[in-house]
UniProtKB/Swiss-Prot annotation:
This protein's UniProt keywords: Acyltransferase, Transferase
Family membership noted in the UniProt record: Belongs to the plant acyltransferase family.
InterPro entries in UniProt: CAT-like_dom_sf, Plant_Fungal_Acyltransferase
The protein's name in its UniProt record: Agmatine coumaroyltransferase-1
EC number: 2.3.1.64
GO MF assignments: agmatine N4-coumaroyltransferase activity
Organism field: Hordeum vulgare (Barley)
The keyword Lyase belongs to this UniProt entry's keyword annotation: no
Gene: ACT-1
Gene3D superfamilies: Chloramphenicol acetyltransferase-like domain
Variation of activity with pH: Optimum pH is 7.5. Half maximum activity is seen at pH 6.9 and 8.1.
Regulation of its function: Inhibited by DEPC. Completely inhibited by ZnSO(4), strongly inhibited by CuSO(4), partially inhibited by MnCl(2). Unaffected by MgCl(2) or CaCl(2).
Length: 439
């Protein structure tokens, strides 16, 4: 598969096409404490659409219209008047790259999570000032692949997914839904007086001197991180949920069961000592958990992490039901009170006084003995329709971070789940042998 780039340009908000006056380019949106707690890195995803797909000029025009409603993605990171990190709404534009492939898309489907897919989207390193970079690649058969690269500190997966859908709505002339909510200053105020009722040191924050303790694998083929895509059918998930919910007052959720199962399988594959502590960090969306609720169209980050913890021996020798109970208890703990405690702590002055930094560190390339879970099961990726139909395939880009688990709904649309599992190559065969076992 040879990808040839033909053009690259900045697309700016097209106010005239929407009958609106240009926005004020002096507008500054300070990052919230929840934005600052998230990963300061670029994330890439890939969509595939069958032919016919709208011409690139139509997609570009739709992008310009969508950016009128989502000016963040046409802006740049900078600082506000007080020196804090902020989004500058300067309408500098999002990057739009046009490319072609020399093969039919069917000949390379399903795309595999290898370095080859990196050619299907721009790199964040290509335009470090731009917050969103898009590549549209036409294949010889007329099919279209759209690759997005976005700065995670601007928004979480749910709000970024809302923008992807908004772009498709603007392209086909439909109203943007949900309506974006931009006023970050109206949310996440600290309480008076502050009430920090949970420990946030060592959870969302860590000492600055530990920020650069990056763990990397050693050289050699056995220490190469490989990403394996695992498909869990609807039938397998039903059996797993029945297995994990035996004797419970109500069935366990798909997310909790799949995470519990993979946590155990990855721990077995790693061959951890029985007394070693292992945890799983699960991203928890606070929109519906906070009171008052944060609107669905909110455009920033509303994520904190549940961190169930146990020993490797306890995890693998006890049934999956035990892991589900650990996960359920910790996820339930990340409630309105926890979010507000975090906000109060982040505004207490302790972060600055103690020189704390976010534990969400994109420089960590090896997470063992722990894992981290990004669940995209409820993000509306498959609602994106430029006018030629919804995508028939979606995937995260190649991201070889050992232990970073990404879950998403299968493109089959039948309730099955795809999991992208990065492990050292030396551990992968053991993982493959146990990941479909319910023992």
């Amino acid at each position: 598969m040879k990808i040839t780039v033909h053009s690259s340009k900045a697309v700016k908000p097209e106010y005239g096409a929407c009958g609106l006056a240009p926005g004020c380019t002096a507008d500054v949106v300070p990052l919230t404490v929840l934005d600052k707690a998230n990963f300061d890195t670029y994330i890439s995803v890939i969509y595939a659409f069958h032919a016919p797909a709208p011409p690139n000029a139509v997609l570009e025009a739709g992008l310009g219209r969508a950016l009128v409603d989502y000016r963040e993605w046409a802006g740049r990171l900078g600082v506000d008047a007080s020196g804090g990190r902020a989004i500058l709404l300067n309408d500098a534009g999002a990057r739009f790259v046009e490319a072609t492939a020399d093969v039919a898309l069917d000949s390379v489907m399903p795309l595999k999570p290898t370095s080859e897919v990196l050619s299907l989207h721009p790199s964040g390193d290509d335009g470090p000032e731009e917050l969103m970079l898009i590549q549209v690649t036409r294949f010889a058969c007329g099919s279209l692949v759209v690759g997005f690269t976005t700065q995670h500190i601007v928004s979480d997966g749910r709000s970024t997914g809302n923008f992807f859908v908004a772009w498709s709505q603007a392209t086909r002339g439909a109203a943007i839904d949900p309506v974006p909510v931009h006023d970050r200053a109206s949310f996440f105020h600290p309480r008076e007086p502050l009430h920090v009722e949970y420990e946030h040191r060592g959870v969302e924050f860590k000492p600055c001197e530990k920020a650069h303790d990056v763990v990397c694998g050693a050289d050699g083929d056995e220490d190469e991180v490989v990403v394996n895509k695992v498909h869990f059918s609807r039938e397998f998930i039903s059996k797993l949920k029945a297995h994990a919910s035996a004797g419970a007052p109500r069935p366990c959720s798909t997310l909790q069961c799949v995470v519990a199962h993979l946590w155990r399988s990855m721990t077995m594959a790693r061959g951890l000592d029985g007394g070693e502590t292992t945890s799983v960090a699960i991203a928890v969306d606070g929109r519906a958990r906070m009171s008052p609720q944060v609107p669905d169209g909110y455009t920033g980050n509303v994520i904190l992490w549940a961190r169930p913890t146990t020993t490797a021996g306890e995890l693998v020798t006890r049934p999956v039901k035990h892991a589900v109970e650990l996960i359920s208890r910790e996820v339930a703990r990340i409630n309105d009170g926890y979010f507000k405690s975090f906000i109060d702590f982040a505004n207490s002055g302790a972060v600055e006084k103690e020189r704390l930094v976010a534990t969400a560190d994109a420089a960590d390339m090896v997470l063992s003995p722990n894992i981290e879970v990004d669940s995209w099961l409820r993000i509306p990726f498959y609602d994106m329709d430029f006018g030629g139909g919804r995508p028939f395939f979606f995937m995260p880009s190649y991201l070889p971070v050992e232990g970073l688990l990404i879950l998403l709904p299968s493109f089959l649309g039948d309730g099955s789940v795809d999991a992208y599992v990065p492990l050292f190559s030396r551990d992968m065969n053991t993982f493959k042998n146990c990941c479909y076992s319910l023992d």
